[in-house]
């Protein structure tokens, strides 16, 4: 389950129209932010704009993580009822159709032995000093969407890079932190970086799938 300890006003409630604080948007993005109208998204069947891969890990909710096969990790969200697939051992196919979750190429960082084929240099340069298990995921082929529910945009040219670091507390609680880096040459003048924490629950009894909401 996601543990929200920061950015409460942007994550736990729908931000006010025009509130893009802390996101490095440019003038073109500002026009879209100021024109946001959730009714238009609903009428167009685009309620899931804020549930695409660049934003979904910031949406409060629960995850189900399982292996679809030896080279594909499946991540399901109850918020928005979304499914992400992390593909090991390859790159995004040319000419793939854009979707909310895009195509995610994954690899374990150097020194990690796990399922999935190892790869080199999917995204940013390898980090140093990380002791926990680290998974790197690079996502492209995205449909344009929102970084926040109030219409802060990202474009179809966005590249999403994520690092997943798993660790165990002395109490035995299992956690992971995902560092999310959104690079968008259309609407951001520098990459937008966040970190988000998740804690493992005892079972899946609190899972509550909900549809996307534009409001």
Positions of PLM-derived features:
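PEST-like low-complexity, intrinsically disordered acidic/proline/serine-rich tracts
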Residues: 1-215
């Amino acid at each position: 389950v996601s543990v929200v300890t920061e950015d409460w006003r942007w994550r736990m409630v729908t931000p006010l129209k025009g509130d893009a604080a802390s996101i490095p948007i440019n003038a073109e993005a500002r026009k879209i932010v100021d024109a946001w109208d959730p009714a238009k998204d609903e009428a167009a069947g685009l309620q899931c704009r804020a549930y695409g891969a660049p934003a979904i890990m910031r949406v409060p909710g629960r995850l189900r993580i399982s292996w679809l096969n030896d080279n594909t990790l499946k991540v399901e969200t109850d918020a928005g009822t979304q499914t992400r697939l992390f593909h090991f051992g390859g790159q995004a196919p040319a000419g793939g159709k854009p979707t909310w979750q895009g195509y995610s190429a994954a690899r374990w960082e150097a020194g990690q032995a796990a399922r999935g084929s190892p790869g080199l240099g999917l995204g940013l340069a390898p980090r140093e000093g990380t002791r926990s298990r680290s998974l790197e995921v690079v996502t492209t082929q995205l449909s344009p969407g929102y970084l926040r529910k109030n219409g802060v945009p990202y474009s179809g040219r966005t590249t999403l890079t994520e690092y997943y670091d798993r660790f165990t507390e002395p109490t035995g609680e299992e956690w992971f932190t995902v560092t999310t880096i959104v690079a968008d040459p259309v609407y951001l003048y520098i990459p937008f970086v966040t970190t988000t924490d998740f804690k493992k629950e005892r079972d899946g009894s609190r899972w509550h799938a909900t549809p996307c909401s534009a409001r």
